[in-house]
Amino acid sequence: PEWFIKKFMDNSVTTKHIESLAVTLRTCAIGWLQSFVEAKGTHVLSSYLIALQTRGSMNEQDLAQEYEVLKAFRSLFNSKPGAHDALQHPKCITGISRSLVSQQLSTRKQAADILLFLCHWEKPRGHSLVLQGLDELRVAFDRHGRFDAWFTALEAAIDGRGRMGSLVGASDEVRRLQMSAMPEAGLPEYVVNNMFL
């Protein structure tokens, strides 16, 4: 765990490193995962995600890294120690909430999945923390309502759908998503996850 954390801390982490971390968190022994949590791995991932999001305009590498960090979070939160640690770090939930308005639809879907899980993990604390994250999203985007920035991104995705469900007239974002090798990241699943959230 320390090797990954060092890569994030000295800002030498690559997209491949983050992919590798997500796979390791998904397949490792629970002891390794607990060591990652105890070494402040959740905090380090949160800080890195927020740093990516606040750089200004994100390039393709930044967008890929944002998505991979969310995959790492998802793997981490699939364990009791990881999910419990997430609720101890509101900054983590803030970063994930900011991903609800990412430029990439697949990233927004991943963020909605994670936040939906956290809402139900430790009631009512998880739900309250997700609402706080949405409040911080409102402040970051200078909106009046808690859900305005999130709903604007959701509405743009729905409006970008092609004619009769095809790619004809679809937005570049929806076109990219449907052409990707991730059938689970389709527009209908994204919309349903947002409805549940």
Map each language-model feature to its residues:
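Elongated alpha-helical scaffolds that mediate protein-protein interactions in large eukaryotic proteins
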Residues: 1-148, 159-167, 176-189
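Low-complexity, polar-biased intrinsically disordered regions enriched in Pro/Ser/Thr/Gly
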Residues: 172-174
